[in-house]
């Protein structure tokens, strides 16, 4: 009987964990695109453009796009940005995704020296307390969420960003819209 309670608890935790991510598109879809991203990565910025210009317009009503954090050690402020995105998503659902877009669109303007000020300005511009947003960078619970994503990615064999998984099928760093769309279309057809 103990194993049953453990299994139920694990299922409940797994269900809750899915909602901690920034999600775009259909929250109810069984077709999931996991996006392992580093918010200081130029290739991730390119993928963000593909997501905004091609994937979301075509699939927002039918596919769940989940953002996962995979900050690379070579990027000085990527982990802070991932933590900030987690805080902002909790403070105001959807704002974490907006921040991810902002960080990727401004990755050449943001640096270690101005990171906190840029975060503060973003938070203030969205009606949040800027000091709380900056203080959240030291929140160990949020840092653990980012680290959990990173470790999950490592366990899946991910080493580069962006890595996109279409119901488990990987696309790594640079890939064409047509290839991702073909995989999504196949998963949508299989789910019918």
Sequence positions of predicted segments:
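Bacterial N-terminal signal peptides
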Residues: 2-12
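A short beta-strand-turn-helix
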Residues: 15-31
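A generic local structural motif
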Residues: 18-22, 51-53, 150-151
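Generic structural signal for beta-strand residues in well-ordered domains
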Residues: 24-26, 34, 58, 157
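Alpha/beta-hydrolase fold active-site loops
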Residues: 31-32, 62
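C-terminal cap of thioredoxin/glutaredoxin-like
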Residues: 36-38, 48-49, 120-192
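Structural alpha/beta surface segment adjacent to cysteine/selenocysteine redox centers
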Residues: 37-124, 190
């Amino acid at each position: 009987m103990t194993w049953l309670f453990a299994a139920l608890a694990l299922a409940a935790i797994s269900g809750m964990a899915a909602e901690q991510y920034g999600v775009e598109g259909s929250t109810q879809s069984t077709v999931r695109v996991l996006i392992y991203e580093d918010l200081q990565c130029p290739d991730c910025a390119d993928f963000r453009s593909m997501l905004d210009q091609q994937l979301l317009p075509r699939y927002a009503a039918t596919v769940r796009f989940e953002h996962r954090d995979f900050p690379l050690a070579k990027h000085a402020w990527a982990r802070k940005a991932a933590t900030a995105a987690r805080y902002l998503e909790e403070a105001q659902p959807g704002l974490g995704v907006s921040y991810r877009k902002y960080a990727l669109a401004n990755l050449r303007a943001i640096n270690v020296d101005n990171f906190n000020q840029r975060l503060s300005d973003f938070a203030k511009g969205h009606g949040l307390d800027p000091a709380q947003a900056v203080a959240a960078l030291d929140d160990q619970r949020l840092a653990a969420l980012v680290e959990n994503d990173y470790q999950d990615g490592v366990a899946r064999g991910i080493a580069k960003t962006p890595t996109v998984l279409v119901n488990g099928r990987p696309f790594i760093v640079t890939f064409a819209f047509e290839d991702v769309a073909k995989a999504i279309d196949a998963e949508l057809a299989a789910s019918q």
